[in-house]
Each structure stands twice: as C-alpha cells, then as structure tokens.
C-alpha cells in the first residue's frame, strides 16, 4: 500500500488533530503518501481531497477541533453517494482509508469495507460510547471541561445557597454525566442507561437541607430530559432556590488534554500499521492500556454499556 487517505467525520472531538497528525507522520515514515479528505464523507463525495505533507500537520497537536473539518453526510448513506466516494478514492489512487469519528463514521467505513475498500476506524467522540475501547478521543478533554464548570458553579451555588442542575451532553450515553458527577461530587446523577426515582432525588435534597447543607449539584445527561424542566420540578417540590446551567457545545472545544493527545497519537499510528499489514475492516481501541483492534462490523452490532460499579459508587457517595 503506497497511498492512504484520512478523514474526520460526525461531531468533532478534542484530539482529532493529534490523530490526523499521527496518521500522516506514521504513514510518511513508512514512505506512504497521505491524502486528507476535507468535510468528512461529504468531501469524499465532492472530491475535496489534497495531499498532506509532514508540514501540513505541524502546530496542530494542541488544537481542538479538526484541521480536516467535519460534517454529517446523509448522501453517503445512499448507494449513489458511496459510489461517488469510491470513484474519488480511485481517482486519487488511494488504497486505504483511516476514518476518525463515532459510530456514524464507523457505519460509513463499514459500507466502504463491504464495497471491498480497506478502512480502519479510530474512535473520536466525546461521548465515550464506542464498544471495544475503554476510552475515545476527546472524552478526557470534555470531562475536564465539565468538571471545571462544576467546580465554578459550585462556588456560586455555595455563595447563594442554591441547588444547581447542570445539563451535559450524552443523548444515548451517560459517561460524561457519570464520570463528571462522580469527580465533581454531585448529589445526583441522571443518565440514559439507568432509571431514576424523582421522589428519591427530591427526598435526598430535602435531607441534605435539613442537616444544614447549603447547596446541591445535580448532573443530567441530555438524553434523560431537559435540565430546565428538571430544575422547575425540583424547585416546586423542594421550595429550594434552583438554577439550571446547560453546558452545550463548550464540551466539544478546547485544547486536548495530555491524555487525549497521547491516546490520539497511539490510535492514529496504530490504524496506519493495520492498513499497511493489509488489515482493513477493523477499528482500533485501547483496553487496559493496550492497543487492540476489532472487526468493525462486530463492534457496530454491540451496544455501549455503562460501568455499573462506577454508577453504584456514585449513588453510595451521594448520600
């Protein structure tokens, strides 16, 4: 294999640039040319493709977002769209592709694999919801962004003796809510993977108030429901002054943490190794700090699960 491509797709995550950098430099180290595909699968269809050199990925390892830009592309879900993409890959002589993104991006890589085109998926999403890997690129940075916000909100919550509901990202996965809630000392954590008892949450807040607690923090993953609505229900039921903070897209931005930069570098380079070994249709990950790879079709058939022991711990510590 003498020429590969790389693209970022779906929602951006801090560390994607570090992964792109690793792909480019690892490939060039092995005398393999690399072509960057801009705007994800949309750029693959439209032909927004250019050759990348070592200098093309200089000064990006510390930057959030993605140099290659990203987009969602419904057209790639059609046979016609994929045929256009494959035609462009052939036009540029690209023999293998590294796809950096979440499960939607993996689905595109799966479709290309079924067309006989070698692809390797690299998990890039703040949601940490890709099976087959302990961590995804961007999760640690997003987690630290949320914890920083929790700490600052707790300061003002204490000053005004208020309850705060903080809504974080996670439509289908509660990892950001669970990890940040545990690290931030939240009184309650609501995630999509677990049922919640509103009466118990209210009772817990009342018990805390009765023993002199001056403030409370509740973390709600967006997939559970509106943080604003939870705030209204809590204030009505407890008569405690309650405020809501929806963190939103700030969770996707920012300079990646050292952990994300290292993870992205390892996974990006490993993806290139697999392509050069002729192993397409795979996706990479890290488990117990060891690099691993799996069949991408099998991973897409699996469902992300929450760490139940961590969830139990969060409940035990929030009494």
UniProtKB/Swiss-Prot annotation:
Primary site of residence: cytoplasm
Enzyme class of the recorded protein, top EC level: transferase
Binding site for Mg(2+): 103
Protein activity control: Allosterically activated by ADP and other diphosphonucleosides, and allosterically inhibited by phosphoenolpyruvate.
Pfam families (UniProt xref): PFK
Cell location: Cytoplasm
Keyword Transcription: no
Single GO BP term: fructose 6-phosphate metabolic process
Associated pathway: Carbohydrate degradation; glycolysis; D-glyceraldehyde 3-phosphate and glycerone phosphate from D-glucose: step 3/4
Cofactor: Mg(2+)
Record-annotated disulphide pairs: none
Residues involved in ATP binding: 11, 72-73, 102-105
Catalysis: reaction(s): beta-D-fructose 6-phosphate + ATP = beta-D-fructose 1,6-bisphosphate + ADP + H(+)
SUPFAM superfamilies: Phosphofructokinase (SSF53784)
Single GO MF descriptor: monosaccharide binding
Entry-linked NCBIfam families: PFKA_ATP, PRK03202.1
Family annotation (HAMAP family): Phosphofructokinase_I_B1 (MF_00339)
Similarity comment: Belongs to the phosphofructokinase type A (PFKA) family. ATP-dependent PFK group I subfamily. Prokaryotic clade 'B1' sub-subfamily.
Record text on subunit structure and interactions: Homotetramer.
Stated role: Catalyzes the phosphorylation of D-fructose 6-phosphate to fructose 1,6-bisphosphate by ATP, the first committing step of glycolysis.
Designated name of the protein: ATP-dependent 6-phosphofructokinase
Species of the source: Bacillus licheniformis (strain ATCC 14580 / DSM 13 / JCM 2505 / CCUG 7422 / NBRC 12200 / NCIMB 9375 / NCTC 10341 / NRRL NRS-1264 / Gibson 46)
Gene expressing this chain: pfkA
């Amino acid at each position: 294999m003498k020429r590969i491509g790389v693209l970022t797709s779906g929602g951006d995550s801090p560390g994607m640039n570090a992964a792109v950098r690793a792909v480019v430099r690892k490939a060039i180290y092995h005398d393999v040319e690399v072509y960057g595909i801009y705007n994800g699968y949309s750029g693959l269809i439209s032909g927004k493709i250019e050759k990348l050199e070592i200098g093309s990925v200089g000064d990006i390892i510390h930057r959030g977002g993605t140099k290659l830009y990203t987009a969602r592309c419904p057209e790639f879900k059609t046979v016609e769209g994929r045929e256009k993409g494959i035609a462009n890959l052939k036009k540029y002589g690209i023999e293998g592709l590294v796809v950096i993104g979440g499960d939607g991006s993996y689905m595109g890589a799966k479709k290309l694999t079924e067309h006989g085109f070698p692809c390797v998926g690299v998990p890039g999403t703040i949601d940490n919801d890709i099976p087959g890997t302990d961590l995804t690129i961007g999760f640690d940075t997003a987690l630290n962004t949320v914890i920083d916000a929790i700490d600052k909100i707790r300061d003002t919550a204490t000053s005004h003796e208020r309850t705060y509901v903080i809504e974080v990202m996670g439509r289908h996965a509660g990892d950001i809510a669970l990890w940040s809630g545990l690290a931030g000392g939240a009184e309650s954590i609501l995630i999509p993977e677990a049922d919640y008892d509103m009466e118990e949450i209210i009772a817990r807040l009342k018990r805390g108030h009765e023993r002199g607690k001056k403030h409370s923090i509740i973390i709600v993953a967006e997939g559970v429901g509106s943080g604003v609505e939870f705030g209204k229900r809590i204030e009505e039921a407890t008569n405690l002054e309650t405020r809501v903070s929806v963190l939103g897209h700030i969770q996707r931005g920012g300079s990646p943490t050292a952990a994300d930069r290292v993870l992205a570098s390892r996974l990006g380079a490993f993806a290139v190794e697999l392509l050069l070994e002729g192993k397409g249709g795979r996706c990479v990950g890290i488990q117990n700090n060891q690099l691993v790879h799996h069949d991408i079709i099998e991973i897409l058939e699996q469902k992300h699960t929450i760490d139940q022991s961590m969830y139990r711990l969060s409940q035990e510590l929030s009494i």
